[in-house]
Amino acid sequence: MPGGYFQLIAQGPADLYLTGNPSISFFKFVYRRYTPFSMELINLPYNTIPSFTPTQSTEAKCNIDRNGDLLHDCYVIYDLPAIYTADYPFSWVESIGNKIIEETSIKANGQNIDRQFGEFMKVYSDLTLSSTKKEKYDNMINGSNNIIRTAIPTGDDTYPALPSKRLFIPLPFWHCKNSGQSLPLIALQYTQMRFDVIYTRLNDLFTIGNPGVSPEELFNSDNLSQYNQDMRDTLLAEGWDQTNVIFRFARNWDQYSAILANYIYLGEDERTKFAQTSHEYLITQLQRRIYLGLSRGPSRLDLVMNYPVKELIWFFRNQDAYKTNDWFNFTDNQCPDLLNDVKDIRKFIMTKCLQTLIDNDTCDCSGNGLKQKLNLSNQLSDLLSQSYAGLYEGVSVSNMNSSQWDYYSIMKDAKLVFNGHDRFEERLGTYFENQQIYKYHTGKGCRGLYVYSFSLKPERDQPSGTCNMSRIDTQQFFTNIFDTDNNPKENDKFDLHMFGINYNVFRIMGGIGQLVFTN
């Protein structure tokens, strides 16, 4: 008798809890028939062609045409130009696809239904996407470390130092995530749905190097300052104009942008049912509060949020980041991606300053030109004799030590106080940065990103816990910013960006769609 039969015979009372009165079989596949449908991606042009400028944000409006029965996932299309440079290193900012979008909203007959922000889109993708999904997401928005490349001058202007690239930026509105939440355009006969997109000014989207100082040093294109030091006019390119600087590198840029929308077409029976039936959709919305110019030490802030909130997400940013377009550095360290290693400097993105100690000699590679592993070969003089450090695969070097600050969290601790009572006791920043993300999210987040969840499963559409902020009169957030004794930047100022994800109901009745709960 085969041994497998002996296992089946060995049954006891405990097995009744597992196999008594079974309701499923693992050896008979059961499927469900589905209603017929089809899908098609269609480009939606803006009502007027947006004109992107270096110094001002640009707003574009896009009517959602009823090209299909339902509207599912949508994307912002944006064409990055080819970059030509024979003298100045040029680099797009990290996650430029997210940074391009200052904010975007979906409206019904002019009523704002939901509003999203490019910076939140970046951090939320860090929180919710698996490593595989995040890799593809970064490919679409030009966000991963191996895509953010610096255009090293090539000696002529014939061929682009950086090629052009079309970005596909996923919009995170409620109807884009789950097909069961798709927006029923067929039922909105008397409602004009519209996307509004505010694009970031161009000067916030790139950095350029100054060969008069060092090929690796970068400065902000807007105020032409290098790490808070005014640059001399003699170091600037002839005819340099900060209001038009991007067009020195980008040639014949058509500045194309549009909305890519996935329309769903239903079978006749289901189409009729959708058109004649009232609908109520449980949707998610995003709230944002910004607190500017916080000093080191304790702060007490009023949240002023509304509706049932399932999760709070926040980050701090040193105001120095605005001077170097270092938008997604949420730490108190100029080089958060450079880690200490005894033998090898591993892959990193240089943001401002790196000091490497080799046999007690200092090699100061300042700037943002190093985008891959830094190859330090036998002699320090070999590196210093080069105009550019070689961008090669890094190798372990004997007797070499790298010295760098920890990435310095900005927030030391925090707590919530509702109507004068502690919602939870004061907790360290590492609790919000690590434990909360580990327990409630799929992704790993990023350094300096903090989370507090009221929900058991905040990533799912099914609600599993909220805090109704509308019923709490006084909402206070107490936080404490590190004041480290050995930190030379003790007078720095910080901005806090606080986001709350809440639920609301979008009701469609008589061809008109509107929110059920409004302030």
Give the role of each language-model region.
Residues 1-519:
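Short, low-complexity Pro/Thr/Gly
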